[in-house]
């Protein structure tokens, strides 16, 4: 079982789902994973944060990600691997500059009989608005649409 919840927002005001998603994310993150009484439970937690600054635009981009995985032994009838794995992750990205602010967050939960490969974490570089750094594509070069370069005509 796995579940992913996404929320993209330009400011939280006017977004009726922003508060609900924040509450859900907090509930999901605080929820005890695994079998609390299991003596052989193993837990792994990862916290990552990255930031980018664009001085020419007075812009900043931030990405933070928290992930927790818990596993514990279980009978072979329940899980062929003999363990159950549960993972919860919360990812939040922000991009802001004087004229705009964009926030995006996602929560992820999975429970499996075998360790799952980690879900892809959005890259901050691919998420930030970088279109202005790439030249626009050239206009069509077909012979019918090609325009001749302007010529200077001298009159005597």
Curated annotation (Swiss-Prot):
The modification Phosphoserine is found at residues 71, 79, 137, 140. InterPro entries: Luteo_VPG. Residues 38-54 are annotated as: Homodimerization. The keyword Membrane applies. GO terms for biological process: transport of virus in host, cell to cell. Residues 55-80, 106-156 are annotated as: Disordered. Residues 57-156 are annotated as: RNA-binding. Residues 144-156 have a biased composition (Basic residues). Keywords: Host cell junction, Host Golgi apparatus, Host membrane, Host mitochondrion, Host mitochondrion outer membrane, Membrane, Phosphoprotein, Transport, Viral movement protein. Signal peptide: none annotated. Pfam families: Luteo_Vpg. Expressed as a nonphosphorylated 20kDa form and a phosphorylated 22kDa form. Phosphorylated by a host PKC-related kinase. Serine phosphorylation is required for plamodesma targeting. It is found in: Host cell junction, Host plasmodesma; Host chloroplast envelope; Host Golgi apparatus; Host mitochondrion outer membrane. GO terms for cellular component: host cell Golgi apparatus; host cell mitochondrial outer membrane; host cell plasmodesma; membrane. Poleroviruses are transmitted by aphids directly into phloem tissue. The virus replicates most efficiently in phloem companion cells and then moves through plasmodesmata between companion cells or into sieve elements for long distance transport. Homodimer. Together with movement protein P3a, facilitates long-distance movement of virions in host. Transports viral genome to neighboring plant cells directly through plasmosdesmata, without any budding. The movement protein allows efficient cell to cell propagation, by bypassing the host cell wall barrier. Binds ssRNA. The N-terminus is involved in homodimerization. The C-terminus binds ssRNA. The C-terminus is phosphorylated. Belongs to the polerovirus movement protein family. This is Movement protein P17.
